[in-house]
Amino acid sequence: MKKFFQEIKADIKFKSAGPGQKLTESVGEKAPKEKPSQPPVRQPRQGPTNEAQMAAAAALARLEQKQPRARGPTSQDSIRNQVRKELRAEAAVSGDPEAPGSNTAPEPKEEGSAHLAVPGVYFTCPLTGAILRKDQRDARIREAILMHFSTDPVAASIMKIHTFNKDRDRVKLGVDTIAKYLDNIHLHPEEEKYRKIKVQNKVFQERIHCLEGTHEFFEAIGFQKVLLPIPDQEGPEEFYVLSEAALAQPQSLEWHKEQLLSAEPVRATLARQRRVFRPSTLASQFDLPADFFNLTAEEIKREQRLRSEAVERLSVLRTKAMREREEQREMRKYTYTLLRVRLPDGCLLQGTFYARERVAALYGFVREALQNDWLPFELLASGGQKLSEDENLAFNECGLVPSALLTFSLDAAVLEDIRAAGTQPDTSILKPELLSAIEKL
């Protein structure tokens, strides 16, 4: 059997070697005439012809049909696999990506951003207003906070405490301990012991020293690090001591404490990437980038196989609990959603949202784009389903992920009042600056 496949391979190589030659034919008669000044160009090795590939594939198929179905893997299976590997290796050398016997489909090429409904998911830094990619968020926010020390060291140190330290429980414990220190100073300004904090104190080390930004905070509100002698101890100890100038302004200390307690981590906000498109028959077609899916590359590939299994699941009797569990798993696949709203004139308003955001966020997004933001309106999903602004439902709970097309509808009573007043609704309800940047979908 091995000899059989070697003959197939030899036949493929023979047929790909080019046209035959006569033994009596001289080299000069065969070789093309070339200019003496130009070196001969080496021709690339030709891969197997389509006929040779089809012959090899047909031979493999005939052999597979002859094998008994009930038998497990045999030595001939190993031979076939080896032949496939060798043919693929030879095809790789000759530059032919579609060698016979290859079971691996070529990787799909990523489409350019010009074909995507949106180029990707982007974020806005709340401190600088810069537009950031997902992988830039942490580094750029850290950089912005550190730069803020030159203008407002107290605010910068508070942002550093709440943003750089990811363990929220540890941050709360440390912040509460600092607040307790400041409360003691505020309540007992005459007590010198409350104005000194021992750095090597166990509570300070376990709750405060381990947090980034705490030392900068103490220094920013008026503490100074000094070495003080300790009774019955040879060497001095390091303390934070509140300066007299800071002690004379107790209201400032109280304000800084409230800032520290009420602060939140600095997070980049999702950029809506608002766009307006002309009326289009492609309004319901969405080609989304990979950023919109909370899946790895392997999981995305597996989705195609799972879709074929969905047909089988529909024929199986499932309980309500089983269906709900499957729906929950489906919702968790998506992190973001791209929503389009078709306006009365047919134009499309598009924006990016978190899949977990509430429907009210979409209403606010649309209202910001209207010339008259007081106009009452409704948003209708596919099938005419009304989405209430007051409902506390997320987009993934409404089935509006990873993309959806909705319809804008003005309140019927408002339209009647406008017509009764002898006026007609505006041709477009969007702000002029948005219409000036309208695009073709």
UniProtKB/Swiss-Prot annotation:
Residues 1-10 are annotated as: Mediates interaction with LMAN1. Residues 27-36 have a biased composition (Basic and acidic residues). SUPFAM superfamilies: PUG domain-like, Ubiquitin-like. It is a peripheral membrane protein. Residues 12-57, 62-81, 86-113 are annotated as: Disordered. Residues 51-63 are annotated as: VCP/p97-interacting motif (VIM). It is found in: Cytoplasm; Cytoplasm, Cytosol; Membrane; Nucleus. One of its GO terms (biological process) is ERAD pathway. One of its GO terms (cellular component) is nucleus. Residues 332-408 form the UBX domain. InterPro entries: PUB-like_dom_sf, PUB_domain, Ubiquitin-like_domsf, UBX_dom, UBXN6_PUB. Transmembrane segments: none annotated. It holds the Pfam family UBX. Keywords: Cytoplasm, Cytoskeleton, Endosome, Lysosome, Membrane, Nucleus, Ubl conjugation pathway. Its main location: cytoplasm. Residues 175-244 form the PUB domain. CDD domains: PUB_UBXD1, UBX_UBXN6. Interacts with VCP through the PUB domain (via C-terminus) and VIM motif (via N-terminus); the interaction is direct. Forms a ternary complex with CAV1 and VCP. Interacts with SYVN1. Interacts with HERPUD1. Interacts with VCPKMT. May interact with DERL1. Interacts with PLAA, VCP and YOD1; may form a complex involved in macroautophagy. Interacts with LMAN1. The UBX domain lacks key residues critical for VCP binding. May negatively regulate the ATPase activity of VCP, an ATP-driven segregase that associates with different cofactors to control a wide variety of cellular processes. As a cofactor of VCP, it may play a role in the transport of CAV1 to lysosomes for degradation. It may also play a role in endoplasmic reticulum-associated degradation (ERAD) of misfolded proteins. Together with VCP and other cofactors, it may play a role in macroautophagy, regulating for instance the clearance of damaged lysosomes. This is UBX domain-containing protein 6. It comes from Bos taurus. The gene is UBXN6.
